């Protein structure tokens, strides 16, 4: 009986200890340490959300307009460009949201599977973007240098796009193969491995864990080299054509000047003998030659403007691709040489946000700058504005002055009785 109060005290102390342990566990679960600083998370998440909205909206607009106009889908160039826009939509829907999830995860959560999926998406985006840009570069070269004998026919373009998607899917699977995700004997051993995610565990420095970086780096540099060589050849081809045509045009001008002088001499000689008919003939020939010279000058100016436009677009395409994807490619090379660390992983996320910016630039560079696409977009906007104006009539018979709507269209002509009588009496007066 004397041990009963001691037992009660021990039971109370043990219950107090267990309650405190439970409270401590709840506190640690509620306040888990974040993998990144709050300002870092907010800024990068804001940029990524902006890229999702702008990239998804612009690429879907381009795809809808391409599908609505059948004449835009018939060409090989537009099909290859549509393939790039489909890829950008996939990146905006799948890859960028997963990067946001990686940013907002805590350190103590089990992020192995999510990190593996994220690395697979990054590998897919990097490889497929580089290959699609490479295909568009070859198509531009084929159009500019060999317009008569094109290498990329419709069948070859379909085969090229099929191979692009197969290789992109293989690049998506490489991070899973690195961690033995598909092997039956591994069990849950892959779950302890982290692929370039900030965590409490150490990074794996084995080369077999970073084969996906070894695939991304050479494809990027190969695409850059091909772009530089191809666009320089395109510009050289345009210069040669303009120069040769311009020189032949000058020769034609000199010949035409000689013919003008000969024609004037002939007209002066013949005018002394045969009078006014030869003078009229000489004037007609001189006028036709002047018109031909004006047309030649106009064509030369149009070629010069086209050359400047192609040169500017080539610089923009190359510079945007280099600006967006060079930092992350160089950082991947640094990770392969020095090994991963928290600082390098954070920098890699920043550079990945820059790389995702191509989803916004691709529609601006490859779709909205084309004249056919601009015509289709303007026509759709005009029809939309006209339908809105006609569907919502203004009260009190208000008149809407719109430059896109012909004011003379659907205009009813009304005459008063006096005007009708005057118009009916006018022919009778004339006949009388």
Swiss-Prot record:
Gene inactivation effect: No visible phenotype, however mice display increased susceptibility to heart failure under conditions of hemodynamic stress.
GO biological process terms on file: cell projection organization
Residues passing through the membrane, by range: 46-66, 86-106, 116-136, 157-177, 209-229, 315-335, 349-369
Sites where a glycan is attached: 16, 192
Topology term for the membrane: Multi-pass membrane protein
Residues in compartment: Cytoplasmic: 67-85, 137-156, 230-314, 370-432
Tissue and organ expression note: Abundant levels detected in the brain and heart and no detectable expression in other peripheral tissues.
Family: Belongs to the G-protein coupled receptor 1 family.
Its job: Orphan G-protein coupled receptor. Seems to act through a G(i)/G(o) mediated pathway. May be involved in ciliogenesis.
Protein's UniProt name: G-protein coupled receptor 22
UniProt organism field: Mus musculus (Mouse)
Lineage, broadest ranks: Eukaryota, Metazoa, Chordata, Craniata, Vertebrata
